[in-house]
Amino acid sequence: MTDSPVLALAKDLISRQSVTPEDAGCQDVMIERLKALGFEIEVMVFEDTTNFWARRGTEAPLFAFAGHTDVVPAGKLEQWDTHPFEPTIIDGYLHGRGAADMKGSLACMVVAVERFIAENPDHKGSIGFLITSDEEGPFINGTVRVVETLMDRGENIDMCIVGEPSSTEVVGDVVKNGRRGSITGDLTVKGTQGHVAYPHLANNPVHQSLMAIHELATTEWDQGNDYFPPTSFQIPNVSAGTGASNVIPGEFNVQFNLRFSTELSNEVIVQRITETLDKHELDYDLKWTFNGDPFLTDTGALLDAVVAAVDEVNSTKPALLTTGGTSDGRFIARMGGQVVELGPVNATIHKVNECVKVDDLEKLTDMYENTLKHLLAK
């Protein structure tokens, strides 16, 4: 039996070992297909990362698909039922690294656009593709750099679907119409090292910090809103001491992260945490990593089109959620346009035996194509 166009393309992409930041030729495959549709292609290589921007049309609105060709490492091969880079169908599921996150989505995007343009060669507006090989890694030279390049020349995306695996039980049951912001602090509290038997000759930074850390951990940062839960403060890593039981440490290192709603900003978080540490008279260094601002698409033509497109395939409307981690949508949202995430079921992403239901790929392709029809068909 011959594979469908979307299944054949998904298999081709999965077979390429594109572990971050490698692309392994995935983008060349997509570019060849898009060139045949009349897209103008701009390859953007930054350091070790390969990206491309493709556009068909010059008029507004500019609708874009965004995604990534890179995947996380497969881990121990012996734990997989099949080779992670040899796509295999088992009981109606396509197995392979990237099947759900997110080479399946990429295949659906390309085939959906091929079908849409075949029926609508003179469509309204413009269609774009923003593809990177740096989403699973440090996200330094990927989507963010492409977005900066486009913004510098005044080329802003009006509407964007990011193909991240948003679904939970059934493809299309969840659309992410926003994401929380993320900020990480690396705090080093300074003390004076000494012998535990002579505490008066030392200054224990752990003891000095406990009240401040407790205050930060129990602070109510906000109450959230209709779209976001309250801001979360979590401590993932702490370290101090030499490993010896008789040495008071000279430094105490605490790493913390906040996932925050649109009720807060990076600036407010930095100010409040700095004020708390200063109030407790700590001697400290604090380095910040700004991972992304929160974004929200609560209304607009894109959201209406995506909800309708999912309903036409599933006969039920998707839930609109902002849960989960960050995605490249946070960078695209800087352009001021509407951004949503719609992709496969996420139950097996980053796991051994990652897989996606073959029928879900066909349904997702229909959802993407229907969205295009709602937005750009004349």
Swiss-Prot record:
- Kindly list the positions annotated as binding Zn(2+) 1: 68, 101, 164
Q: Name one GO molecular function term.
A: cobalt ion binding
Q: Does the keyword Amino-acid biosynthesis apply?
A: yes
Q: How is the cofactor bound?
A: Binds 2 Zn(2+) or Co(2+) ions per subunit.
Give the EC number: 3.5.1.18
- Pathway linked to the protein: Amino-acid biosynthesis; L-lysine biosynthesis via DAP pathway; LL-2,6-diaminopimelate from (S)-tetrahydrodipicolinate (succinylase route): step 3/3
Enzyme class per UniProt: hydrolase
Specify the superkingdom.
Bacteria
Q: Which reaction does it catalyse?
A: N-succinyl-(2S,6S)-2,6-diaminopimelate + H2O = (2S,6S)-2,6-diaminopimelate + succinate
One biological process term in Gene Ontology: diaminopimelate biosynthetic process
One Pfam family here:
Peptidase_M20
Tell me which NCBIfam families the record gives. Answer: dapE_proteo, PRK13009.1
| Record-stated family | Belongs to the peptidase M20A family. DapE subfamily.
Q: Supply the name of the protein.
A: Succinyl-diaminopimelate desuccinylase
